[in-house]
């Protein structure tokens, strides 16, 4: 047997998630999937590795993601490839390839790992996971409102809605931003001494990114800077006004943040973020916006679009921070543990357990394997905290009976095999009583 090399560790900023962790992951993902499905969104899957040029064309070369954060490599054929730093570009590329956007509306969702070479810290990792939704082919503010409503519904279902607030802005059209960019540069040039090194680096290449600076001195300076909303084109102004009216009608609270711009170049018009102060410092849990030009920019037919991405690690941190884990107790442990004593009973235990699963597919039933004595089997059962233990010995196997031990009520009974499922259904209040389609 090979010895484990103590020096082999996970890559910095990339984490293992054990069964005790994935319970919460699965719970969150199932809620998000169920909500997206109820709105008619369908899953799409695409590779985690893409051609590097895809991200350079979509995200913008003068961005932190492209300049500093991408995992790039060259394969054996000399192709320049990248581990995806975000999902929208790959989703659009896949949609173009398979003709999803040609005179069609599409509502899609996906989840999976993304990769950015950043300094690891709480809630920010080099491999992180996003749950995202994208809607293609709809130009009006009503689809913007729908995506925001979806996220609001997700927070409520997860029990974190009181710890999140919505921030909105419109960054207008490309021509709007070009006009504003000139005014912003002129203002900043008069205040160079108040700019930090990052702001100075971005001054002429991507000055709008200075608006979301974390530097206190630069933030104070920007209070007197020109505001992007004053330079919006009429179409963007009307679009944003109608979106705000819709959110007011729908009862979704929000704050207009004139400094919200997002870090990727493909955005236009609506941008939004759900933020929290419950993690010590202000953190973005979810971000999104419109990208009406991206499909055409990447070689497809013109298709307006909007999407959002939820950072799953940050959602988990927030749930843990506010101690909202009571929702998981029912999912942590199994319902039934099956103990068997003797070679013949083990075979019959497996047969009976499969019949029970076919009748009660939602039942969490674990069968003990390996022929341990009854003391060891009960020890293993107790680790999983079942409500019911089923016990089958050789006599039970012969007369087709089973011992049902209710650990909660501390009662015990003997049942015929064909009566076990109905009894479990009654004790555990299982409502689903369907049969497997095999």
From Swiss-Prot:
Q: Does the keyword Glycosyltransferase apply?
A: no
Indicate yes or no for the key word Transport.
no
Q: Which residues form the signal peptide?
A: none
Q: What is the catalytic activity of this protein?
A: tRNA(His) + L-histidine + ATP = L-histidyl-tRNA(His) + AMP + diphosphate + H(+)
GO terms of biological process kind: histidyl-tRNA aminoacylation
> TM segments?
none
Taken from the UniProt entry, a GO cellular component term is: cytoplasm
Top-level taxonomic group: Bacteria
Q: Which SUPFAM superfamilies match?
A: Class II aaRS ABD-related (SSF52954), Class II aaRS and biotin synthetases (SSF55681)
EC numbers on record: 6.1.1.21
Q: Name one GO molecular function term.
A: ATP binding
Q: What class of enzyme is it?
A: ligase
**Known InterPro entries for this protein?**
aa-tRNA-synth_II, aa-tRNA-synth_II/BPL/LPL, Anticodon-bd_dom_sf, His-tRNA-ligase, HisRS-like_core, HisRS/HisZ
Compartmental location: Cytoplasm
**Keyword annotations for this protein?**
Aminoacyl-tRNA synthetase, ATP-binding, Cytoplasm, Ligase, Nucleotide-binding, Protein biosynthesis
Q: Which Pfam families does the record match to this protein?
A: tRNA-synt_His (PF13393)
Name the family the entry cites. Answer: Belongs to the class-II aminoacyl-tRNA synthetase family.
Q: Subunit info?
A: Homodimer.
Name of the featured protein: Histidine--tRNA ligase
Q: Which organism is it from?
A: Blochmanniella pennsylvanica (strain BPEN)
Taxonomic lineage is: Bacteria, Pseudomonadati, Pseudomonadota, Gammaproteobacteria, Enterobacterales
